[in-house]
């Protein structure tokens, strides 16, 4: 016994604060490893809040956020190549505060990129279109100097925007992440309006050491339902 009895035990001993008597609690081993997750929402703010929480848990450099362009960031009305095919209609954000939500994730230190099924021939138009709507992915994308080499008709990457050229989002994204090199992200968060795109990503990446959170962004369907069209 560490303390002698003098009428009563010292309250200090009962609190475990005396040298040699205190029990040392095991040091925390860090956060639980991330798990795969599937969800759906019509609100980018939800994806933003959850991604920022993930950055606090695992570190912003360990979380890659991939946001679909077509009918997720921009209202393309189902036509991914509308502005690239000579149609100069004004393209607006799908959600009024979309650029603000993206900026919040960027300020939290997350790696954030946009992903589109458009081809490399649409790079200039697409980046200009995003910029005119308040989006800038260059600073929050892969580090300066990163080069994703691909042949004509294959996926390409420019200024934080990934052009998959309809080659399959999952295999293309896996190739992009591997090309960026280690350290690989612990978790990839993907938001897109097309379930098949999300399924492709989940199938290609989720069985590796990298886990995936997929979010089906269904605002387009909600808008159609609300207008009765």
Please state what every model-predicted region is.
Residues 72, 115-117:
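Ser/Thr-glycine-rich phosphate-binding loops at phosphate-binding pockets of nucleotides
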Residues 26-29, 108-110, 119-229:
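C-terminal cap/substrate-recognition subdomain and adjoining C-terminal extension
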Residues 2, 7-13, 19-67, 84:
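Non-catalytic pre-domain segments flanking phosphatase-related domains
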Residues 44-54, 96-97, 170-179:
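A Trp-anchored, charged/polar loop motif used as the substrate-binding/catalytic surface
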Residues 40-43, 90-98, 122, 164-172:
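Phosphate/oxyanion-binding active-site loops and adjacent basic polyanion-contact surfaces
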Residues 86-113, 120-124:
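Short, acidic loop-to-helix structural element flanking the phosphoryl-transfer center
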Residues 55-95:
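N-terminal carbohydrate-binding/catalytic regions of secreted carbohydrate-active enzymes
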């Amino acid at each position: 016994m560490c303390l002698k009895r003098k009428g009563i035990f010292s309250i200090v001993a009962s609190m475990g604060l005396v040298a040699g008597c205190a029990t040392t609690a095991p040091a925390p081993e860090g956060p639980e490893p991330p798990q795969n997750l599937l969800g759906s929402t019509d609100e980018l703010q939800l994806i933003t809040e959850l991604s920022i929480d993930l950055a606090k848990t695992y570190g912003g450099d360990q979380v890659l956020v991939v946001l679909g362009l077509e009918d997720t960031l921009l209202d393309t009305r189902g036509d991914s190549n509308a502005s690239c095919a000579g149609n100069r209609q004004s393209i607006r954000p799908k959600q009024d505060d979309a650029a603000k939500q993206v900026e919040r994730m960027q300020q939290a230190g997350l790696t954030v990129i946009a992903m589109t099924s458009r081809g490399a021939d649409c790079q200039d138009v697409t980046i200009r279109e995003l910029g005119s709507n308040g989006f800038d992915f260059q600073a929050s994308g892969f580090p300066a100097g990163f080069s994703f080499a691909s042949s004509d008709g294959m996926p390409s990457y420019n200024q934080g925007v990934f052009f998959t050229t309809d080659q399959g989002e999952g295999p293309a994204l896996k190739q992009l992440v591997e090309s960026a090199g280690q350290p690989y992200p612990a978790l990839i968060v993907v938001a897109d309006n097309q379930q098949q795109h999300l399924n492709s990503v989940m199938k290609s990446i989720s069985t590796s050491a990298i886990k995936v959170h997929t979010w089906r962004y269904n605002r387009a369907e909600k808008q159609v339902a609300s207008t009765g069209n």
